[in-house]
């Protein structure tokens, strides 16, 4: 299986020296599974784009220091690609900024939260009705580091993770899209 990693941001300086890039962190995570994956990397910030959603078997969008509302030039084609991947049926995962830009591309609303920053270990409620055949505990504790949030999920999205601080911390969209605010 070939995973396409759409790079929307990266670590810098000492963090990158110590922990690697966002893309390399995800590769290390996937390497811990029993499955063999190959990878294609697209730095969308500099105009690196796949030929089509079919260029990879599944897709992941990384985090970013940029906000969806910054409307940077690369965000419009990324949102178009998100819609195409969603419609193609290929699996798509969004983490942090990836969660936010997927929501925006599919009709949701993303804003800087009036609650400020969410930092540290947060407890999220799992909506059992939304996860269906994907067994999860009633709550998950995941590190958070964000001030932007999906304020309104896309129509048709099923929110499966929520907290008082972040009511839309993860959602399913159709059968092939899943997103997580925390990481």
Stretches with model-predicted labels:
Residues 4-6, 40-42, 60, 93, ...:
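Hydrophobic/aromatic beta-strand patches that form the interior of the parallel beta-sheet core
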Residues 106-182:
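Pocket-forming structural segment of enzyme catalytic cores
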Residues 16, 51-52, 105, 153-155:
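Short, well-ordered secondary-structure micro-motifs
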Residues 62-130:
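Cysteine-nucleophile active-site neighborhood
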Residues 1-88:
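N-terminal beta1-alpha1 cap of cysteine-dependent amidohydrolase-like domains
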Residues 43, 98, 148:
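Catalytic metal-binding/acid-base residues of hydrolase active sites
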Residues 11, 47, 67, 100, ...:
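Surface-exposed, flexible loop/turn segments at secondary-structure boundaries
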């Amino acid at each position: 299986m070939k995973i396409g990693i759409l790079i929307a941001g990266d670590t810098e300086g000492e963090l990158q020296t110590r922990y690697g890039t966002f893309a390399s962190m995800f590769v290390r995570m996937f390497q811990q599974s029993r499955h063999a994956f190959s990878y294609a990397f697209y730095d969308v910030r500099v105009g690196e784009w796949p030929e089509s959603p079919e260029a990879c078997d599944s897709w992941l969008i990384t985090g970013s220091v940029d906000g969806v509302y910054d409307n940077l030039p690369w965000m419009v084609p990324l949102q178009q690609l998100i819609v195409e991947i969603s419609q193609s049926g290929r699996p798509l995962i969004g983490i942090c900024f990836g969660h936010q830009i997927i929501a925006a591309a599919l009709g949701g609303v993303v804003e800087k939260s009036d609650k400020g920053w969410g930092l540290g270990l947060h407890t999220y409620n799992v909506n059992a009705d939304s996860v269906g055949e994907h067994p999860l505990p009633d709550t998950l504790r995941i590190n958070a580091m964000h001030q932007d949030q999906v304020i309104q999920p896309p129509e048709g999205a099923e929110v499966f993770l929520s907290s008082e601080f972040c009511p839309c911390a993860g959602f399913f969209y159709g059968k092939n899209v899943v997103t997580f605010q925390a990481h």
